[in-house]
Curated annotation (Swiss-Prot):
Record-linked Pfam families: Ribosomal_L28 (PF00830)
Any one annotated GO CC term: cytosolic large ribosomal subunit
GO BP: translation
HAMAP family in alphabetical order: Ribosomal_bL28
Annotated GO MF terms: structural constituent of ribosome
Descriptive protein name: Large ribosomal subunit protein bL28
Family per similarity comment: Belongs to the bacterial ribosomal protein bL28 family.
Organism: Azorhizobium caulinodans (strain ATCC 43989 / DSM 5975 / JCM 20966 / LMG 6465 / NBRC 14845 / NCIMB 13405 / ORS 571)
InterPro entries: Ribosomal_bL28, Ribosomal_bL28/bL31-like_sf, Ribosomal_bL28_bact-type, Ribosomal_bL28_sf
UniProt xrefs under PANTHER family: 39S RIBOSOMAL PROTEIN L28, MITOCHONDRIAL, LARGE RIBOSOMAL SUBUNIT PROTEIN BL28M
Keywords noted in UniProt: Ribonucleoprotein, Ribosomal protein
Keyword Ribosomal protein assigned: yes
Amino acid sequence: MSRRCDLTGKAVLTGHLVSHSNRKTKRRFLPNLCNVTLQSDVLQRSIRVRISANALKSVDHRGGLDAFLLKARDEELAPRVLELKRQIVKAQAEAPAAA
């Protein structure tokens, strides 16, 4: 399991831990990843994803998983979530035709 956010693409960064005397030792900055279950209103089901805490706030801010995925760039999304985005777009296209 990689340490990468499924929605925003945030990953591990490397840098230095700098002491008071300015000595530098290598360190890793890990993303704050959470395993969460989000509800898709269009697909009428819940989806389990591993996302950063920042992405969780962004999903809430945009009004849910469906709205977030529709605005998100495809390059940032994990392949599994990208397939989910395509399913949402397809379901939305079929919904007005059925109504």
